[in-house]
Regions:
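Positively charged n-region of N-terminal signal peptides that target proteins for export
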Residues: 1-10
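Bacterial signal peptide processing site
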Residues: 22-24
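Non-catalytic cap/lid and distal C-terminal segments of serine-dependent acyl enzymes
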Residues: 32, 54, 61, 65-356
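C-terminal motif of bacterial Sec signal peptides marking the signal peptidase cleavage site
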Residues: 17-20
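Post-signal peptide N-terminal segment of mature Sec-exported envelope proteins
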Residues: 29-52, 56, 63
């Protein structure tokens, strides 16, 4: 009897042990299965019912794809390649004229700011785009006039640049942007009329620093001007074309888009260009080499076949840029001279390729 009792006890203990082992095995299997489901949902997210904990976890992991899509959308804006299309110079004159029913934005004239570079007040004209919102952030194009001009040369009520931008914006050819008519003269206003060519050239050179040090901060403080080189462009014609190249290469970390239209040959030394003259004094001994992250986003050079002065200098600048490995677009355009007919078609091309 005692032997039977002992045997029954041993059998009961063994059965309990087997049941316990089975329960532990089931727990381990469930944990592995649950972990596998979470990993699978992270990668493929199949349609299935999930617990509250799993649902919360999935909400957290799916935030990553949302951020990625936002980044892709931001990147898509920079995927536009301004070098992928040729520029156009045979344009309808109506592009530069006022058209009924077109919003040409808001033109602010004779806006004054203090320039520490000039140690005096300077003035600019400012074009705000249609629908301007002071709480927004708009890229800015700084436009520099030629020798003897001022901030009103290209941007005044009804000017070609004023009408051109409004018409391009209406047709979806231009991005919302602020355009600033820059005064290249950077010095004491009281002595401007007394300066000779060398003195005027020295005052013009100072605009390179004035734009970056004084004017850009003024625009950000008083207007909805976006920061960053991807939101900043500089363009100029003739002497202003030289200064736009100087400004762009002096401040590569601040300026991403540069246009030198028939630029004078004083950015760097150009052999045979007005020797021993204030026209030929080089601003740079050597053109600064951009780092990989400060390469111009779009660099545009153009000159007309009938230009009496700056064909050689423009071509030389292009050759130097090519030797430096700096991407740029150089157009030698048949039939155009050194005048506003050329400036306006070039600005059409430049405005259509910036801030995309």
């Amino acid at each position: 009897m005692m032997k039977k009792l002992i045997i029954l006890v041993l059998i009961s203990a063994l059965a309990a042990g087997m049941i316990a082992c089975h329960d532990n095995s089931s727990d381990t299997s469930y944990q592995k299965e649950t972990k596998s489901v979470v990993q699978t949902e992270y990668e493929t997210q199949p349609e299935m019912q999930t617990s509250a904990i799993q649902t919360e976890a999935l909400q957290e992991v799916t935030e990553a794809p949302v951020q990625k899509e936002t980044g892709q959308a931001d990147q898509k804006k920079t995927d536009f390649d301004p070098y992928s299309t040729d520029n156009v110079y045979d344009l309808n004159p109506a592009l530069f004229e006022r058209q009924d029913g077109t919003d040409y934005g808001t033109l602010l004239t004779d806006v004054t700011y203090f320039s520490t570079t000039a140690d005096d007040d300077k003035r600019v004209n400012i074009l705000l785009p249609p629908g301007y919102d002071e709480t927004g952030a708009y890229p800015v194009l700084y436009m520099i006039h030629g020798w003897g001009g001022d901030y009103t040369a290209h941007l005044y009520d009804g000017s070609y640049l004023h009408m051109l931008y409004g018409n391009m914006y209406r047709d979806g050819l231009a991005e919302p942007m602020i355009i600033v008519g820059v005064d290249m003269y950077t010095g004491k206003q009281a002595i401007k009329d007394d300066l000779d060519g060398y003195g005027l050239r020295a005052a013009y050179d100072k605009t390179v620093d004035d734009i970056a040090v004084d004017l850009m901060p003024f625009m950000r403080e008083h207007y909805a001007a976006a920061q960053g080189r991807e939101n900043t462009a500089v363009a100029g014609v003739s002497e202003g074309g030289a200064k736009s190249l100087c400004t762009g290469f002096q401040w590569l970390d601040k300026i991403g888009y540069i246009a030198g239209i028939a630029p004078d040959g004083n950015v760097i030394s150009v052999s045979g260009y007005y020797s021993d003259s204030y026209w030929s004094i080089p601003y740079f001994d050597v053109l600064p080499q951009p780092a990989q992250d400060t390469m111009p986003i779009y660099l545009y050079l153009a000159v007309g076949s009938e230009d009496p002065w700056n064909i050689h200098s423009t071509e030389y600048f292009s050759e130097v840029l090519e030797s430096m490995g700096v991407s740029h677009q150089y157009d030698y355009v048949e039939g155009f001279g050194h005048d506003s007919d050329f400036w306006r078609v070039c600005m059409y091309n430049f405005i259509g390729k910036i801030f995309k």
